[in-house]
Amino acid sequence: MNKPTTISFHVPPKMWSEFQESMLKSRMFNEEVIGFFFCQRHQVSKRKIRYIPKTWVVPSPDCYEHQSATGLVLTQPFHSFLLENYLRVGLDVVHIHTHAGRGMPDFSYIDDRYESEYAQFISSGFPQKPRLISGVFDEDFQSCQFRMWDRKGRKFEKVQFCNSLFEVATNENDMNNPDLMFARQKIFGEANQRLLNELKVALIGCGGIGSIFAELLGRLGVKNWVLVDPDRLETLNLNRMPGATQEMVEQRWHKVHYVKHLIKRIYSEGSCVKTIPTSIESELARQEIATCDLIVVATDNHFSRKMAQEIALEYMRPLVCLGTHIDMKQDHTPRMYCRVSVPPMGGGWCLMCGNIISLQRAAFESAPAEIHQMVGSVGYIEGVNDPAVFWLNSICASTGVGVIHGMVSGFLNVDSGIDWVYEFPGSDWRKTNTEYLRSDDCFFCC
């Protein structure tokens, strides 16, 4: 018997909060209200579909022909506006309305009839054949149901609604049998621990920062990984990669297999680690990264960061970028930095428009070998890798893990994104005002 397809409607928390507030403001008493999300369909896997909103609309009171506690009707001009501006560009529609009362609401007979006709209408009236997802909430927006109609409007499937950064399944057995390994993390809540245990993380770059990061996040409870890195272990890596040995170097271990070894030392069973010993450019890497709940890039080049950011933007996945830098001042004293950046998922700024990635350097790094030699000879890029030390990488990696823990637990607000820079020997954390990272004309995120 085939497993059923899992369909989820995923809304970033900032977008959901704004939508919910706008819905509540659009009624005077306890009238029903309606709002719309226009979504991109993302086929995560053969049996998993995710709907990601690109924009939302809540009609103002003058957009209703009729509005009461028992029903509502939109004006024809407003409805035509929605069709022309959103459905014709190939987006699917999620329409959400409220019912009076508190507790789990049910779809009414009128809902069934209207939605069945509407699902058939939009799929036959537009070349892209958009799908209709409908949701009903109680008047306080505390309880809800969602469903997706087929294109003929004859039957529907259940849709999971998720209004957090992360979307994971709930395993009833895990709820009843908490893992003693994490007993001293109970202060953060059992639901938070289950979320960490189910979280699927893509790690791009399994070197000095990435390996420490994987060890730390793994011990926090993350068991599901996709590891991407084309490189093999070398002797010069041994000073900053925990548990790496000369024997691994001599056996020419790929870094992804070394990091998998670190995770499997923590979890002899119950973990799932996919290793992809290629660059992020490969189609296999891209497909696997797109299935993850969170993308972390810990590489030492701009091109891979650019690719990771583009994937995160396309599939609306949270992205965490980790990096360090060391240079020497004229008096031969070192300046050391680490940087942790999390662009906002709902848009506003990305690593490119925030100048966290140099597109010029990314272009050089993706160029053929002969171009590298040419630009190197005229001083555009250096031929020696940046210096690195274990303890600075550890500060960066552990801060990144702390940020993710805060994102999962809800005690760190990243709606506007964060960009933190640590400087040593001053031992200062500088927190960028992300308003200055915003760009209205960024080609990538606007």
Predicted regions and their residues:
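Glycine-rich phosphate-binding loop and adjoining beta1-alpha1-beta2 segment
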Residues: 224-268
